[in-house]
């Protein structure tokens, strides 16, 4: 459960959030949408411990994330991130990228199993820089599966992809969500928003 209470955030003279409140239940698929500059990514970053609010609280499973001394543990294990730029080690193979995560988090799933889940097992020995953008984002999704975070924060993950690859990524995100994970997605692309999603217009 994520509870946001009386959240305030401003940049210079621009108020992005004023006494903003929101509750997100475990296992929801939530979409933040709205015009450019409305605060979608800022809100996601505040939930993800990447950007501090001016005041107010963000509570995840009973822990106020901006007051706890266990922020690093929360960041490392509870939250998983999916960005537009993939954040992979391009000079390493697909399998090497996943083994780094598997070793760190001691996942119950093997890297090969994660690759099979995203349909990329045959690329395991390929250097990441040789993959298409859509394939790289699927590797990033396989990495999330290995991390097994309860909350997935996805910031414009289809922003640089064509429609076909965007649809594949969204299908995989919904698959992760249906396994019991909470997914919070930021997008400006109405086309990828599913009827199954809870849409928050900012």
Regions found by a protein language model. Give the residues of each.
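Conserved ABC ATPase "signature" region
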Residues: 108-123
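Helix-to-loop junction immediately C-terminal to a conserved catalytic motif
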Residues: 48
């Amino acid at each position: 459960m994520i509870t946001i209470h009386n959240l305030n955030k401003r940049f210079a003279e621009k108020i992005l959030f004023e006494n903003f409140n929101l509750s997100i239940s475990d296992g929801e698929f939530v979409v933040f949408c709205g015009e450019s500059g409305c605060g979608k990514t800022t809100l996601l970053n505040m939930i993800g411990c990447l950007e501090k609010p001016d005041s107010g609280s963000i509570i995840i499973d009973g822990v106020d994330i901006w007051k706890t001394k266990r922020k690093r543990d929360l960041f490392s294990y509870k939250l998983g991130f999916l960005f537009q730029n993939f954040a992979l080690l391009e000079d390493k193979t697909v399998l090497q990228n996943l083994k780094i995560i598997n070793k760190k988090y001691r996942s119950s799933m093997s890297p090969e199993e994660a690759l099979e889940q995203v349909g990329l097992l045959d690329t395991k020995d390929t250097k990441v820089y040789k993959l298409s953008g859509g394939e790289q984002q699927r590797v990033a999704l396989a990495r999330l599966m290995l991390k097994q975070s309860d909350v997935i924060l996805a910031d414009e993950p289809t922003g640089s992809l064509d429609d076909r690859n965007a649809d594949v990524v969204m299908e995989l995100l919904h698959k992760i969500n249906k396994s019991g994970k909470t997914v919070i997605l930021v997008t400006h692309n109405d086309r990828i928003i599913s009827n199954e999603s809870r849409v928050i217009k900012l």
